[in-house]
């Protein structure tokens, strides 16, 4: 398009969230895109606009000829949940995450975190939900529970998407919180598919560059690190317990 005010060409106009799936080039309809920042979102490409409550349906690209739709899941408390942990526990989340490192996927003795930080979004939709721990633990276990809750909320949205689309063959992770290897491994375990994390964390900028360049076929994707799924039954069992607690607490 061209701005009527200055006759300056506008090659692309889009929201930051909508360009993330294009960071590695053309849209992969066999993938689900998970961006992990202050909040998180899950995008699952679809050929048509689907009505799939409690998920959202969004248009992420439209050029006058083609339209790309996605099912969208929203998680308000990702990095923000770690900020919540710091305020309420008085412990540095960065230090706790460093201590957790790239270790065990699950701690069966850890409490659960019912994560409604900044409002509980999909698939529960309870804006006034009170975030809280169920059970007691050390500062390290509490931090693990918060990190784990982010993975669990993503998993809950993926489960909803699987009711309307075939399960994805992989997850594509981006955003600042995706730098946490333990979280990426949790997502791989819970989803049962590999998680690909791009080496370039600026997914928004890369996605926009791809669209502005006219979606070139030779667009160079950044190298990825792949996290293969580890079928850790302890983490899967914790997810089911957490899901039951969330449903009870939210009245879902």
Where are these regions (language model features)?
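Active-site core segments that coordinate phosphate-bearing ligands/cofactors
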Residues: 2-174, 179-252
């Amino acid at each position: 398009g061209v701005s009527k005010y200055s006759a300056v060409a506008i090659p692309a106009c889009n929201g930051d969230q909508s360009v993330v799936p294009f960071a590695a080039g053309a849209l992969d309809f066999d993938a689900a895109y998970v961006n992990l920042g202050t909040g998180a979102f899950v995008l699952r490409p679809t050929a048509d606009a689907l009505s799939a409550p409690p998920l959202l349906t969004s248009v992420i690209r439209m050029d006058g000829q083609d339209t790309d739709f996605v099912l969208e899941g929203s998680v308000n408390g990702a990095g923000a949940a770690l900020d919540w942990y710091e305020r309420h526990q008085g412990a540095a989340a960065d230090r706790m995450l460093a201590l957790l490192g790239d270790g065990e996927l699950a701690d069966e003795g850890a409490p659960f975190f019912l994560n409604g930080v900044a409002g509980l979004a999909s698939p529960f939709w309870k804006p006034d939900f009170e975030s809280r721990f169920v059970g007691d633990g050390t500062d390290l276990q509490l931090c693990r529970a918060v990190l784990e809750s982010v993975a669990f909320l993503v998993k809950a949205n993926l489960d909803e998407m699987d009711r309307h689309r075939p399960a994805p063959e992989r997850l594509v992770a981006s955003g600042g919180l995706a730098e946490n290897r333990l979280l990426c491994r949790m997502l791989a375990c819970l989803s049962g598919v590999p998680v690909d994390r791009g080496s370039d964390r600026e997914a928004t900028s890369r996605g926009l560059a791809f669209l502005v360049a006219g979606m070139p076929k030779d667009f160079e994707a950044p190298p990825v690190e792949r996290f293969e799924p580890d079928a850790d039954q302890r983490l899967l069992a914790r997810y089911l317990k957490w899901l039951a607690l969330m449903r009870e607490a939210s009245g879902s």
